[in-house]
Regions:
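A cross-family phosphate/adenosyl-ligand binding-site feature
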Residues: 2-158, 164-228
Length: 228
């Protein structure tokens, strides 16, 4: 399902400008400042860093789009490089999957404030540099600042940590962000699904991430006990 949806997207939008969200459609109808406060669609922030597994972030955006969840995307420059290296997609195509896209240096973006209500954030994939910044509260870009907002506002923050092996520093950072309220989610392959492809494994990880937001995308196998 997600595989077919991914390859059906070909929209290209310009890169986000500073202090301005980048809507995927008409800016007059998609500006978050003009939308009614209630009722509103669920909002989730997606941040992509330069860690490997860019496809996880792309598939997460696709799944949320399929569920009609309003998405706010922040992409680092190294995420853009990883997308180009690991996939057949251009960063502009990935940005087009989100409702809004922000420059990582835009510290005045709506998502940088706790008064802008969201239902949580996923950093996918999450580099160890980003993890360290979130742990220390060192908000030097929009990704770390928005993650800091999630923690202080007691909103769901999921960090899809992508590194192996892990040093003591990595483990300490993971422990501290967990104590602060985040969920550390290593995308461990679920071999019990008997995957037929890498994308089967990616889809299973994406589904499990969205389970943490009480969102069911379907289309992936769940454990139901030993099958005879």
């Amino acid at each position: 399902m997600l595989h077919n949806f991914l390859h059906g997207s070909g929209t290209i939008t310009p890169q986000s400008s500073r202090h301005s969200p980048e809507p995927a459609g008409d800016p007059d109808t998609n500006n978050p400042h003009t939308m009614p406060a209630n009722p509103r669609r669920k909002r989730i922030v997606i941040a992509m860093t330069g860690a490997t597994d860019a496809l996880l972030g792309i598939k997460t955006l696709l799944a949320l789009r399929h569920l009609n969840i309003e998405t706010h995307l922040i992409m680092s420059k190294w995420a853009e490089a990883t997308i180009k290296y690991e996939t057949d997609y251009h960063p502009s195509n990935v940005k087009a999957l989100a409702d809004y896209s922000y420059n990582i240096n835009d510290m005045a973006a709506p998502v940088s404030s706790g008064s802008f209500k969201t239902n949580g954030m996923v950093v996918v994939p999450c580099s160890m540099k980003t993890l360290a910044g979130i742990h220390s509260g060192f908000c030097d870009d929009l990704i770390s600042r928005t993650a800091d907002v999630m923690l202080k506002e007691r909103r769901r923050l999921v960090l899809v940590a992508r590194e192996t092996p892990l040093s003591e520093i990595h483990l300490r950072n993971m422990l501290e962000v967990t104590r602060a309220g985040a969920v550390v989610f290593p995308p461990v392959p679920a071999l019990y699904v008997r995957p037929g492809s890498v994308e089967d494994l990616v889809d299973q990880s994406v589904g499990r991430v969205l389970d943490l937001f009480d969102l069911d995308i379907g289309g992936f196998e769940r454990w139901e006990g030993w099958k005879r």
